[in-house]
């Protein structure tokens, strides 16, 4: 294993909601692929401790989803806060990609980046300023070739590592069926 500036960092966060001014990160996971989307390594999947008061602010969808997945209980049991989760993630990433080289990769990744900026700023600046957002291709396919969308189905577990693996697989699907190389 050696840091390679062409490797891609994929990330997913689960949050208590969508507003970084009010809501918090409750799970973070990362993985690294090479430029051809082969998974090289999976980083730690970390439940980030939040107070009962913070968890009580979740809307019905988040309560239902994160309770069903077991995430709420893992968050309550976790001893890692934002900073500890950020440092553990950075420790993993530094082995695979130099700072400032990989765009932030994932699905609707701008939302995750807003939370990183607020709660994990050292991790946020580790990424290049560019985005590799799989949802962009999904939106283009919906408009230009909608039949392609039927060929890829996501499980939608809303568990961070599962979601990242699906994002990588979804981009590989679009590369094969939508992007002309």
UniProtKB/Swiss-Prot annotation:
Which GO MF terms does the UniProt record name? 3'-5'-RNA exonuclease activity; nucleic acid binding
Pfam families, per the entry? RNase_T
Which residue ranges does the record assign to the Exonuclease domain? 8-171
What SMART domains would the database entry show?
EXOIII
User: What keywords does the record list, in alphabetical order?
Assistant: Cytoplasm, Exonuclease, Hydrolase, Nuclease
Which cellular component terms (GO) are annotated to the entry?
Answer: cytoplasm
Which EC class is this protein assigned?
A: hydrolase
Gene3D superfamilies associated with the record: Ribonuclease H-like superfamily/Ribonuclease H
> Superkingdom, according to UniProt?
Bacteria
User: Which Gene Ontology terms describe the biological processes this protein takes part in?
Assistant: DNA metabolic process
Give the signal peptide range. Answer: none
- The annotated active site, in chain numbering, is 129
> What are its E.C. numbers?
3.1.15.-
Subcellular localization, per the record?
A: Cytoplasm
Could you say which protein family the record assigns here?
Belongs to the oligoribonuclease family.
General function of this protein: 3'-to-5' exoribonuclease specific for small oligoribonucleotides.
Q: Which HAMAP family match?
A: Oligoribonuclease
Task: Supply the name of the protein.
Answer: Oligoribonuclease
| Source organism of the structure | Shigella flexneri
Gene designation: orn
């Amino acid at each position: 294993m050696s840091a390679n500036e062409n490797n891609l960092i994929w990330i997913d966060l689960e949050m208590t909601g969508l507003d970084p001014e009010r809501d918090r990160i409750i799970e973070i996971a990362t993985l690294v692929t090479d430029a051809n989307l082969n998974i090289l390594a999976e980083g730690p999947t970390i439940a980030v401790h939040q107070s009962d008061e913070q968890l009580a602010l979740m809307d019905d969808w988040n309560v239902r989803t994160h309770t069903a997945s077991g995430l709420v209980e893992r968050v309550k049991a976790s001893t890692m806060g934002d900073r500890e989760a950020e440092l553990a993630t950075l420790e993993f990433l530094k082995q695979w990609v130099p700072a400032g080289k990989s765009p932030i990769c994932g699905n609707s990744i701008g939302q995750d980046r807003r939370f990183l900026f607020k709660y994990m700023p050292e991790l946020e600046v580790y990424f290049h300023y560019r985005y590799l957002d799989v949802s962009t291709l999904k939106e283009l396919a919906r408009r230009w070739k909608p039949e392609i969308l039927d060929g890829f189905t996501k499980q939608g577990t809303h568990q961070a590592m599962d979601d990242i693996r699906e994002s990588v697989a979804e981009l590989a699907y679009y590369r094969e069926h939508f992007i002309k190389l």
